[in-house]
Amino acid sequence: MNKLKLIFAGTPDFAARHLAALLSSDHEVVAVYTQPDKPAGRGQKLTASPVKELALTHNLPVYQPASLRKEEAQAELASLGADLMVVVAYGLILPKVVLDTPRLGCINVHGSLLPRWRGAAPIQRSIWAGDTETGVTIMQMDVGLDTGAMIRKVTCPIAANETSTSLYDKLAELGPQALVDTINAMAAGETAAEEQDDALANYAEKLSKEEARIDWSMEAVAIDRCIRAFNPWPISWFEVAGQTIKVWQAEVINSDHGQPTGTLLKADKQGIDIATGLGVLRLLTLQPPGKKAMSVSDLLNSRRDWFEPGTQLN
């Protein structure tokens, strides 16, 4: 097997886990690209990405262009003489000239079984839609949005209580080994790519805080999926007594209620039961304004007046 010279491009922790796997492989990471440092925290202090932090601990050259569309940035990348560029949740668009620069092009690790869930939020949308299976796809990048030919797929089940946090961790365990296996196969000239069927494609739109507002007219199972999909961001929410309450955890109670949707049916230490379009949703872990997430029993100790049975939620 030939040893390949790699450029790695990525930004969040998910990407850093893949970089770590490459650093333990037989290949050479010659440079790392990541997003420019961004303000974070209450002090809005400029903060390096997880990928940059890992790269610096390994004394790797780090490049942080705001765009790869400028000739200067493209020439700089070309001067690295890489065989392959690996892209994992980088966050910048790669122009065709960049895609064509490395000898073997650019490959991407995507958190879904393409062509299902192309786009920005595949992990969240797979839970939101009620999928029972997802996985990681390694693809050869082209100029489209997640449209490139697929080199390798690995699958994993989506559990009934899966959140985006837990599924993210599952895929972050699966992806790195799949990536290393793919690069090893490419180095040996043993890969075969499969074109995507565009007729089977759908798009994982970005999440928004407004979308996370709970619609009690939906079925309880659908609301529960939203709550799990929007954890850890933007967190599903509703309003009661003029307060915005975030919902971190709930469960579906299969019972008829005969009440208008959004009616608060009962509130006790087991949970807060809400009438939905079909079935009852029991709220288990809530976060009131300015507080950390807490169990319903803890919240009722201080704010039972917000959750009187018969209260109508918007």
From Swiss-Prot:
It comes from the Bacteria. Its EC number is 2.1.2.9. This is Methionyl-tRNA formyltransferase. PANTHER family: METHIONYL-TRNA FORMYLTRANSFERASE, METHIONYL-TRNA FORMYLTRANSFERASE, MITOCHONDRIAL. Keywords: Protein biosynthesis, Transferase. Belongs to the Fmt family. SUPFAM superfamilies: FMT C-terminal domain-like, Formyltransferase. It is an enzyme of class 2 (transferase). Attaches a formyl group to the free amino group of methionyl-tRNA(fMet). The formyl group appears to play a dual role in the initiator identity of N-formylmethionyl-tRNA by promoting its recognition by IF2 and preventing the misappropriation of this tRNA by the elongation apparatus. Coiled coil: none annotated. (6S)-5,6,7,8-tetrahydrofolate binds at residues 112-115. One of its GO terms (molecular function) is methionyl-tRNA formyltransferase activity. Gene3D superfamilies: Formyl transferase, C-terminal domain, Formyl transferase, N-terminal domain. Signal peptide: none annotated. It comes from Aeromonas salmonicida (strain A449). CDD domains: FMT_core_Met-tRNA-FMT_N (cd08646), Met_tRNA_FMT_C (cd08704).
